[in-house]
Amino acid sequence: MEEGLIDRLLETLWLDRRLSQNTLNGYRRDLEKIARRLSQSGRMLKDADEADLAAAVYVDGEQRSSQARALSACKRLYIWMEREGIRTDNPTRLLKPPKIDKNIPTLITEQQISRLLAAPDTDTPHGLRDKALLELMYATGLRVSEAVGLNFGNVDLDRGCITALGKGDKQRMVPMGQESAYWVERYYTEARPLLLKGRNCDALFVSQKKTGISRQLAWMIVKEYASQAGIGHISPHSLRHAFATHLVRHGLDLRVVQDMLGHADLNTTQIYTHVANVWLQGVVKEHHSRN
């Protein structure tokens, strides 16, 4: 019964909202977790009340972000159940997500980015691929899943832009800049054929297995060159943070940055204003004569 409800909800979300498979899998994990906790008290998703759900969601010792995510999944479920006539009420209506302290992204400086981008050996096919990948990710602010999911058809070198497929399969066009376009074109014409060795592959960035690179490989590439450049605590998402923060610092309108990042809500983008301000405060503290 519980699995059936979850399956029906996820099918509806996929059909109506075109949510990505990763998002749907996340909803499934959270709802199955809540269903297991309810079953320990002899209750089910279908008949749980507000108190049951509060006890299942707000578990001592669990991260608040996990609680908030589980509550969000529950709210979607009960809105759908009420709409479908499975229930006549929504027991999550008054439940509030726990307050979460915003994690300010660690800022990578432009000097560190320069060292990172200079690290790959572009005289080798793998190094040229890695150089193109790093340049593109920093130039566009792509999520790692968007970068590894690119086909060459998504890249318009003449216009200097790419078409990214973001969350919910939403497309957006992002300028890639001359430097990034140069390295992507060099990789595509010089290194990619050597990596594929005659095989056909739609993916822009390919591995020695002659298939598109995975998110895990992209993560390893970033970590490897960050280590070579003497930069710690960096991930592919750090390049996205750096892209946004550096644009805001140089005065680009926040709504333009929002569009380039593919954020649905401007509030999500505003964190980069704070990061840029923190950087500015540090510069003043270091260089002002009164500090």
Swiss-Prot record:
Enumerate the InterPro entries for this protein: CB, DNA_brk_join_enz, Integrase-like_cat_sf, Integrase_catalytic, Integrase_recombinase_N, Integrase_SAM-like_N, Recomb_XerD, Tyrosine_recombinase_XerC/XerD
Q: Which cysteines are joined by disulfide bonds?
A: none
Which GO cellular component terms, listed alphabetically, does the Swiss-Prot or TrEMBL entry include?
cytoplasm; Holliday junction resolvase complex
The active site lies at: R143, K167, H237, R240, H263, Y272
Q: Does the keyword DNA-binding apply?
A: yes
Keywords on record: Cell cycle, Cell division, Chromosome partition, Cytoplasm, DNA integration, DNA recombination, DNA-binding
**Protein's cellular compartments:** Cytoplasm
- CDD domains in UniProt: INT_XerDC_C
Which residue range or ranges hold the Core-binding (CB) domain?
1-82
Q: Which family does it belong to?
A: Belongs to the 'phage' integrase family. XerD subfamily.
Name the job this protein performs. Answer: Site-specific tyrosine recombinase, which acts by catalyzing the cutting and rejoining of the recombining DNA molecules. The XerC-XerD complex is essential to convert dimers of the bacterial chromosome into monomers to permit their segregation at cell division. It also contributes to the segregational stability of plasmids.
Question: What assembly does the database describe for this protein?
Answer: Forms a cyclic heterotetrameric complex composed of two molecules of XerC and two molecules of XerD.
Write the protein's name.
Answer: Tyrosine recombinase XerD
Q: Which organism is it from?
A: Neisseria meningitidis serogroup B (strain ATCC BAA-335 / MC58)
